[in-house]
C-alpha cells in the first residue's frame, strides 16, 4: 500500500504551499509550470517540508527547494502516476521488458490525442512493454496537457507507468529512447514557404540540440511536423552525437493513402497491396511508386492496365487526399496520421515480412539510388525489428521514375539551402520557386 510521509520541522504553516507537490515515481512531471493541488490541505507544514509518496522502501523523494520564500520541487505529479511500482515484485509484470521512455511534442494537439492512447495501450510496442510518456507542450497548452494526463490516468492502462509533462525540451527529452516530434507551427494565411521553413526550422534546431544533450545516445526520432523532411534534417544536424540514420520523416500516411488508391482501382482489399514506396519529399513532388508495387503478388502495371491513370490520376489522388478530407469533414487528418505514426514505428520494431518493404524519410548518405547525399528523403526500407533499418537495393528505377525522383530531390536541395543557417552549412539562400508544393490540408 502506498504511504505518504511528511517530514516537518517544529514551525508550522496553516496550509500546504500551492507550489509543493507530491513526488510520483510513476509520475506526472510539470516542467516550467506549477499546478494547484487537486487535493485538500494535508497537514500543517513549512517551506522546508519534504514530501514523498512511495510503495518501495528504496524510493527517494526529491528535496523541496526554497525560492523567494516559496517551496518548489524539481519534479511534480498527481494521482496514480505518483506511485512507485516494483515491476519485478508482481507475478503478472515480472516477465515484462524494461520500461522505455517515449517523448511526444505537440502533445496537446489532435494527432497526439489519438496517438497517446495507442502508445499507452501496448498496440505499438507490445503487450509486455511498459512505457513512460514524456509530453512536450507550450506555456499556452499546459492546461490542455494536464487534461490529456487526466484522460490517460482515467484509462487505466497497465503498461503506462509514468507521465511527465513540460515545456522545456531539455527536461522532457531526458533519457528518452523514442522521440515523436509532432509539434510545429501551422502555415498561416499569406505565409511563404520560406517563412514556414525558418519558423519551424528554429523549433527543430532547438529540439535537436535538446535531444543531443539529454536523450539516450541511440534515441530513435520520428519527425511529423511539416515540412517534415527538412525539419528532420535540421534536427539531426543539431544532434551530432546521435546517429543520423536514427532520424525519420513521416511519409507513412502517403504510403497508406497510395495503397488505398491502388486497392480501390484494382477492386481488392488494401492488404493485397505490397511493396509500396513513396520517394522524396512530403509534398506535391512526392513520388508514389507504382513500378515496384504489387497487388496480390503481381506487378501493379499487370493488374491495372490503365497506365495513364497510374501516371497521372494515381499520384494526384494521393496528393489531394488530405485536402478532400478537409472539404468533407472540415478538419485535417489527425486520426489517420496517428495511425500512420503507429505503422511507422511498428515497421521498425517488427521484422519486415519477407519480400516486402515500407517507406520512411531517412538520411541519404550511402544510398544505392544515386540520390544526392545530405538530405532526408523517403525511400524503401526493411527492418529486422530491432529499431534499425536497411535500404532496399532490389528495386527497379526506369526513366519515368528517375525523372520524378529528381524533381523531388531538387526541391529538397532548395529547402536545404533555405535553412543553411540552421544546419551549420553557411548562409541561407532561398530559391524555392513560384510553385507552392505544400500538400493540401497541411498548410
Swiss-Prot record:
Catalytic activity entry: (S)-malate + NADP(+) = oxaloacetate + NADPH + H(+)
GO molecular function: L-malate dehydrogenase (NADP+) activity
Family listed: Belongs to the LDH/MDH superfamily. MDH type 2 family.
Protein's UniProt name: Malate dehydrogenase [NADP], chloroplastic
Record function comment: The chloroplastic, NADP-dependent form is essential for the photosynthesis C4 cycle, which allows plants to circumvent the problem of photorespiration. In C4 plants, NADP-MDH activity acts to convert oxaloacetate to malate in chloroplasts of mesophyll cells for transport to the bundle sheath cells. Plays an essential role in the regulation of catalase activity and the accumulation of a hydrogen peroxide-dependent signal by transmitting the redox state of the chloroplast to other cell compartments.
UniProt site positions, description: Activation of NADP-MDH: 77, 82
Assembly with partners or alone: Homodimer.
GO cellular component assignments: apoplast; chloroplast; chloroplast envelope; chloroplast stroma; mitochondrion; plastid; thylakoid
SUPFAM superfamilies from the UniProt entry: LDH C-terminal domain-like (SSF56327), NAD(P)-binding Rossmann-fold domains (SSF51735)
Amino acid at each position: 500500500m502506498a504511504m505518504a510521509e511528511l517530514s516537518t520541522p517544529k514551525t508550522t504553516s496553516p496550509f500546504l504551499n500551492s507550489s509543493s507537490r507530491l513526488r510520483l515515481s510513476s509520475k506526472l512531471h510539470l516542467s516550467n509550470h506549477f499546478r494547484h493541488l487537486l487535493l485538500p490541505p494535508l497537514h500543517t507544514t513549512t517551506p522546508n517540508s519534504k514530501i514523498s509518496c512511495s510503495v518501495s522502501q528504496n524510493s527517494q523523494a526529491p528535496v523541496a527547494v526554497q525560492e523567494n520564500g516559496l517551496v518548489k520541487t524539481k519534479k511534480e505529479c498527481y494521482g496514480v502516476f505518483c506511485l512507485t511500482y516494483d515491476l519485478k515484485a508482481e507475478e503478472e509484470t515480472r516477465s515484462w521488458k524494461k520500461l522505455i521512455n517515449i517523448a511526444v511534442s505537440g502533445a496537446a494537439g489532435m494527432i497526439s490525442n489519438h496517438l497517446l492512447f495507442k502508445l499507452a495501450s501496448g498496440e505499438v510496442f507490445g503487450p509486455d512493454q511498459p512505457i513512460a510518456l514524456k509530453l512536450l507542450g507550450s506555456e499556452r497548452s499546459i492546461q490542455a496537457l494536464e487534461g490529456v494526463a487526466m484522460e490517460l490516468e482515467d484509462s487505466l492502462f497497465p503498461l503506462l507507468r509514468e507521465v511527465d509533462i513540460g515545456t522545456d525540451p531539455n527536461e522532457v527529452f531526458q533519457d528518452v529512447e523514442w522521440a515523436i516530434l509532432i509539434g510545429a507551427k501551422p502555415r498561416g494565411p499569406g505565409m511563404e514557404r520560406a517563412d514556414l521553413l525558418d519558423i519551424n526550422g528554429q523549433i527543430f534546431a532547438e529540439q535537436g540540440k535538446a535531444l543531443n544533450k539529454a536523450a539516450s545516445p541511440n534515441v530513435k526520432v520520428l519527425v511529423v511536423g511539416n515540412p517534415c523532411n527538412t525539419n528532420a534534417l535540421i534536427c539531426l544536424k543539431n544532434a551530432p552525437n546521435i546517429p543520423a540514420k536514427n532520424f525519420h520523416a513521416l511519409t507513412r500516411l502517403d504510403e497508406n493513402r497510395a495503397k488505398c488508391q491502388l486497392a480501390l482501382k484494382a477492386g481488392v482489399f488494401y492488404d493485397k497491396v505490397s511493396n509500396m514506396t513513396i520517394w522524396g519529399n512530403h509534398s506535391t513532388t512526392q513520388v508514389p511508386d507504382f513500378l515496384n508495387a504489387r497487388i496480390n503478388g503481381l506487378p501493379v502495371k499487370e493488374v491495372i492496365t490503365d497506365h495513364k491513370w497510374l501516371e497521372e490520376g494515381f499520384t494526384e489522388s494521393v496528393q489531394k487526399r488530405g485536402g478532400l478530407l478537409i472539404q468533407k469533414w472540415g478538419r485535417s487528418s489527425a486520426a489517420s496520421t496517428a495511425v500512420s505514426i503507429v505503422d511507422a514505428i511498428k515497421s521498425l520494431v517488427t521484422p519486415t515480412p519477407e519480400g516486402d518493404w515500407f517507406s520512411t524519410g531517412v538520411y541519404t548518405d550511402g544510398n544505392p539510388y544515386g540520390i544526392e547525399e545530405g538530405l532526408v528523403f523517403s525511400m524503401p526500407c526493411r527492418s529486422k525489428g530491432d529499431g534499425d533499418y536497411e535500404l532496399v537495393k532490389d528495386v527497379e528505377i526506369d526513366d519515368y521514375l528517375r525523372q520524378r525522383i529528381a524533381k523531388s530531390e531538387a526541391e529538397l536541395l532548395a529547402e536545404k539551402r533555405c535553412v543553411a543557417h540552421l544546419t551549420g552549412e553557411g548562409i541561407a539562400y532561398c530559391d524555392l520557386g513560384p510553385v507552392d508544393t505544400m500538400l493540401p490540408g497541411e498548410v
